[in-house]
Amino acid sequence: MKYNCDESIDRQGTQSAKYQMLPDGTPEGALSLWVADMDFRCAEPIIKALHDRVEHGIFGYSLYKLSEVKSTVVGWYKKRFDWDVEEKNVFFSPGIIPALSALIQLLSKEGDGIIIQPPVYFPFAGKIGVNRRVVANSPLIRVDGDYVMDYETLEEKFADPKNVGMILCSPHNPVGRVWSEDELRRLVEIAKKYDKWILSDEIHFDLVRKGVKHTPLLKICPEYADKVVVCTAPSKTFNLAGMQISNIVIHDPELQEKWLGLVDDCWGMMMPNAMGVTAMMAAYTQGEEWLDQVIAYIDENMKAACAYVKENLPKARMDYPEGTYLLWLDLSEYCGDPEKLAEIMLKKAKVVLDDGYIFGPEGNGFERINVACPRSILMDCLERIKTALVGA
């Protein structure tokens, strides 16, 4: 089936955070390219599966054949990444952020430090803080124009006895790096040296550019598996964030028991949402054709955006993202004041973006743009930014 990613779909009135949770003072007619979900209609097999479930008309307590659900998840891992995962090591959560919060509670105590790599997805720092832990920053650095891990600083952070572990973003949001096997192995060796854990948020794992390979962290360190947790979900991949289902891969039997004690017994989240399971099963068994077309479309959007920026915003700096559908645009040469830049984007350009400073001070002067939308909307957004910064 051929899917039409150029179709513009009105999402008003659908409880869409992207279109209804807008900043105060958002002008009429502003374009919304901030929240990381897609403006593409879901794969037809997913829609049909949900229709069939809804048509039944009864939505009582659900009991799943967990082996069937988990088999579908690990089958996807094997097919897309040649990653062998045992079903017994897969656990469910309404989302990766709730899972990270639970894991922080299980693996650390109040006052412990947890390493992150800014500029990075801001809920990492938020969940560390709300759980009364301490953020230990090891910022990414630029080498020959590319973002890379600062292994010297990472070693210092891991060596510090106050720091007990790390949250990794892989692929990295917002900078778009897809870490190579060598980069990941080097990171694991440092963690292993100091016997520290790593929580790897891999929610964007399916969304990489053509020719780029994502490596699940657990795949390359079986000997250290008890100290690594990998978090995945169908939500970014298949535009299912509202379905609230994520898959958490935990190897350590002791941590598995603690997880069940907290998430199942204490919080009562024993089973995933009925619609979430229905959507995920359809996605992982029948959604690949849709996904391949969407990835190809996003790749072309990225190319079009890069070409436009190079020609029309010569003082901007932008790396071609290896993964995600997020563009990390450095506009600091046009406006060095991050709050003023944010105001220009909202009030003058009339585009709602994720302002770089929310990802940490390393993001000052940047804007994060979601390109998972019809190309006409993306190009309109870039044209508005250009007009606001350099004139028509």
Describe each model-derived feature in a short phrase.
Residues 116, 137, 199-200, 353-355:
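Hydrophobic residues in well-ordered beta-strands that form the structural core
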